[in-house]
């Protein structure tokens, strides 16, 4: 996770918050076929230490890509988190990719906007084995030297992790180290989409 200048971060937060307000204004009664809204719930591992953590997500398709708007509350204040698109919501999580960062304000609220492919066609594929760059090699999760071959695997779930095990510990959570940040030394998962079936995560329902 790379820190940006504070001024830029504040401006981005204001713009994202404005976009969030517009995105959620329609409400569930005005949902269209090209957008979905759903909630993320607190993960089992964070239930005791962050019982009020939750998030609302809205995804709007423009056809060529989707805009995802996230509004999270009940998180520790001024804390960094990492957001992933994942195969299944709970451990072992399956195939996953690092979508971006989420940072809370002094009230423990966070707003974020991502643009990418977040619908029924979201998948990971590796037609063959190939060498992979080994950049972050610290234990316990060093970079792999090559990828495994896999047919297309659909990834319809979402998850949010503490960027740091210390941040987790400082907030009464387990200080378990996980690979879910840019340098593969994150804390535990905080939010996920386990309120949806394993094979039918929320992204599956968006079919523009």
What are these regions (language model features)?
Residues 24-208:
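N-terminal leader/targeting pre-sequences
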Residues 1-10:
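Bacterial N-terminal signal peptides that target proteins for export
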Residues 15-24:
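C-terminal segment of classical bacterial N-terminal signal peptides
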Residues 13-14, 66:
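Generic hydrophobic/packing signal
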